[in-house]
Amino acid sequence: AGHKVADLAAQIAGVQGAALAEKDLALVMIGMNDILELYASYPATGRDALLAEARTRGAAFGAQVNQLALRGPAVVVLTVPDLGLTPFALAQNTSTGDATRSALISALVAAFNNRMSVALINDGRLIGLVYADIEVQNNVKFAASFGLANVVAAACRADAPLPGCTSATLVDTATASTWLWADALRLSPAGQSRLGLLA
């Protein structure tokens, strides 16, 4: 399993070399695995309880980012992309027979991101916030304007999962520059590039 908010403090503490200071830049993006963990417990755990836990984890993330920023480095934090728009989420609508699954995932992401963002120190100096969720939503809604030909399917072939996927192992018609998703959950180089422009 991938890292979650609860693992962030140890990751920061494990940074090699001198302590992070005011001449350093820390880029922080975490939360996808928290959202997936919460979603996996549905419907055994109800929607309201899951949303409450997403908010709790978002607040914890915001608090950790604040602690990092107060230690000296400039911090750029990215919200969790809207996972409700991923190929994974769209497939969940079909495989579960419940067409509201992707909307639930989007709601969990929104609850997490909203609580995280309001927890951040907002003085315009310590922390920069990149709205990855809104960027993904815009890319899906206005795909042609962003030069995207496909925003619903994964570009990587199933037999060439990340990180082994390359431009030679894409599904037919896919390109790294015109498909939004690399796999069922992760952005392609095109999607990552757009986040980089925002940061």
Question: Could you describe each region identified by the protein language model?
Answer:
Residues 76-80, 86-89, 97, 198:
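A sequence-level detector for low-complexity, Ser/Thr- and acidic-rich stretches
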Residues 17-20, 107, 124, 190-193:
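Alpha/beta-hydrolase superfamily serine-hydrolase fold, recognizing
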Residues 24-30, 34-37, 69, 74-79, ...:
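Structural recognition of the beta-strand scaffold that forms the well-ordered cores
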Residues 1-5, 31-37, 81-85, 134-137, ...:
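Solvent-exposed loop/turn segments at secondary-structure junctions
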Residues 1-63:
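Conserved SGNH/GDSL esterase-like catalytic core that processes O-acyl groups on lipids
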Residues 4, 8-12, 57-64, 105-108, ...:
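Stable alpha-helical elements in mature extracytoplasmic
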Residues 85-111, 118-185:
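Mobile gating loops/cap/lid regions near enzyme active sites that modulate substrate access
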Residues 17-22, 26, 68-70, 121-122, ...:
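Extracellular/periplasmic catalytic domains that process cell-envelope and extracellular macromolecules
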